[in-house]
């Protein structure tokens, strides 16, 4: 098979990230230098981001049967690379005083980013599985990166075992789907799916097993049990990556699969997904209420956010609006999560053992770091879906999709879940403005706003506010990113 120059241009982000992985690996082998390797990783990711401009010029195309490069894949590639860049930026000051090998961190983040880019373009179950494994395997190492602490090691072991189990479910599900349909391409699957999936027991069993695998990767109830422990045990920059890049890439490819192969047309599949969505919304929010650890709280809240997003997946028949909803919601979720985890990373840097993760550490933050407290407030309000923030635009879209598709019970659950969520987000926000404790346990550096991580956090806060008040640029961008058949 010959690859034309056009196809090479279409694959630029993938090739650049892959090349950066090799360069960083050789650089580590030659000489360990934290600054040099961090710079190489960030430069490589920035080049991959800029290369999207040339990919856009090349136009939509199928590069091999495994990958479809179009505006949709470019949008999700961009989000994954932004999340990876933020992870590297937050990790640099944290790793500066880390007592063990530091350089491999960037290597693992780059390999996971490569997996995310593969997922964004996947149009075949084989590339979907390769992408998911590429994103999951480095995370085993990243979650346990602070292995001197028992909690980080425990989180890594939990994540490794459960992730391996989920991958085997996913693979077995794909095998059954292949046994029934004889195809692994998304489009070909769509052609072999009849409206009466119920009468195709092999296909139904395969879809069920795949939903279990995806449910674990997206931490949906009842496959969510690892989430709070792993978010708490992983270093703050890794929790950032887990909450953003891996969720966004996997949900992006799941959305494409459901559009090309309309599984949600089957009443049985819709009912199962609906039950998972409602359980995730309510359970995620109810469990977050009792948390006194901010990383656990954000872990439970991510379960609820993915539950809201499932509404758009179930209503995938009203395609245009559904795809628009997922794009806007995930962009809002990305910037809100980057800001929230960014503040935790800034408070936890440089490395001093456990992260600054108890809510008590943030009590009275406003009185000595007012701008940082204001940023955290904006992020909490956005995650809660308060008007004037980007989070509100996403929630509004989700409810609009639910109403449009007549999914009344799901729309009711979104409203109820958001109301419960308001309580713990506001509890976190209020504690920032209480009188500070006599002795400050943890604090961010005084010049945090002039560090690279501080700049990322401030840009996220500005984007959340500006796009919350005037969302048209984002909506136009998401409309451009409609997948072409």
UniProtKB/Swiss-Prot annotation:
Enzyme class: translocase
Subcellular location: Cell inner membrane
Listed GO MF terms: NADH dehydrogenase (ubiquinone) activity; NADH:ubiquinone reductase (non-electrogenic) activity; quinone binding
One GO BP annotation of this record: ATP synthesis coupled electron transport
Keyword annotations: Cell inner membrane, Cell membrane, Membrane, NAD, Quinone, Translocase, Transmembrane, Transmembrane helix, Transport, Ubiquinone
The keyword Cell cycle is annotated on this UniProt entry: no
Listed GO CC annotations: plasma membrane
Entry EC number(s): 7.1.1.-
Transmembrane spans: 8-28, 35-55, 75-95, 105-125, 127-147, 159-179, 203-223, 235-255, 271-291, 297-317, 326-346, 373-393, 408-427, 449-469
UniProt keyword Lipid metabolism present: no
Annotated function: NDH-1 shuttles electrons from NADH, via FMN and iron-sulfur (Fe-S) centers, to quinones in the respiratory chain. The immediate electron acceptor for the enzyme in this species is believed to be ubiquinone. Couples the redox reaction to proton translocation (for every two electrons transferred, four hydrogen ions are translocated across the cytoplasmic membrane), and thus conserves the redox energy in a proton gradient.
Subunit (UniProt): NDH-1 is composed of 13 different subunits. Subunits NuoA, H, J, K, L, M, N constitute the membrane sector of the complex.
Name by which UniProt lists this protein: NADH-quinone oxidoreductase subunit N
UniProt gene name: nuoN
């Amino acid at each position: 098979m010959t690859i034309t120059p056009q196809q090479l241009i279409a694959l630029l982000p993938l090739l650049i990230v892959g090349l950066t992985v090799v360069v960083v690996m050789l650089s580590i082998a030659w000489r360990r230098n934290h600054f040099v390797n961090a710079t190489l990783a960030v430069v490589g990711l920035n080049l991959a981001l800029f290369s999207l401009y040339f990919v856009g010029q090349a136009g939509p195309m199928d590069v091999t049967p495994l990958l479809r490069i179009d505006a949709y894949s470019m949008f999700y590639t961009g989000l994954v690379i932004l999340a990876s860049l933020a992870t590297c930026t937050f990790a640099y000051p944290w790793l500066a005083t880390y007592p063990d090998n530091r350089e491999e961190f960037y290597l693992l983040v780059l390999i996971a980013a490569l997996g995310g880019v593969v997922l964004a373009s996947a149009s075949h179950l084989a590339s979907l599985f390769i992408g998911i494994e590429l994103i999951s395997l480095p995370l085993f190492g990243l979650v346990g990166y602070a292995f001197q602490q028992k909690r980080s090691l425990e989180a890594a072991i939990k994540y490794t075992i459960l992730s391996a189990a989920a991958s085997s479910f996913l693979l077995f599900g794909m095998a059954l789907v292949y046994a029934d349909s004889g195809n692994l391409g998304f489009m070909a699957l769509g052609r072999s799916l009849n409206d009466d999936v119920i009468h195709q027991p092999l296909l139904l069993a395969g879809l069920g097993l795949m939903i279990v695998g995806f449910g674990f990767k997206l931490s949906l109830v009842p496959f969510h049990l690892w989430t709070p422990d792993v978010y708490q045990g992983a270093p703050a920059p890794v929790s950032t990556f887990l909450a953003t890049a891996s969720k966004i890439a996997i949900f992006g490819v799941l959305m494409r699969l459901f559009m090309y192969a309309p599984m949600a047309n089957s009443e049985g599949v819709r009912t199962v997904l609906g039950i998972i969505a409602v359980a995730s919304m309510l359970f995620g929010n109810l469990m977050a209420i009792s948390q006194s650890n901010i990383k656990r709280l954000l872990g439970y809240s991510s379960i609820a956010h993915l539950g809201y997003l499932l509404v758009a997946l179930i209503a995938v028949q009203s395609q245009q609006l559904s795809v628009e909803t997922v794009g806007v919601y995930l962009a809002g979720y990305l910037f809100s999560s980057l800001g929230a985890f960014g503040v935790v990373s800034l408070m936890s840097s440089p490395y001093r053992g456990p992260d600054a993760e108890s809510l008590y550490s943030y009590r009275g933050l406003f009185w000595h770091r007012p701008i940082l407290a204001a940023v955290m407030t904006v992020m909490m309000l956005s995650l809660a879906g308060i008007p004037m923030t980007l989070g509100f635009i996403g929630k509004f879209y989700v409810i609009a999709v639910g109403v449009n598709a007549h999914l009344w019970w799901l729309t009711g659950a979104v409203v109820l879940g958001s109301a419960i969520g308001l309580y713990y987000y506001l509890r976190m926000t209020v504690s920032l403005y209480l009188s500070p404790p006599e002795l400050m346990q943890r604090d961010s550096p005084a010049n945090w706003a002039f560090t690279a991580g501080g700049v990322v956090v401030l840009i996220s806060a500005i984007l959340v506010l500006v796009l919350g008040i005037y969302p048209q640029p984002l909506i136009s961008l998401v409309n451009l990113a409609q997948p072409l058949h």
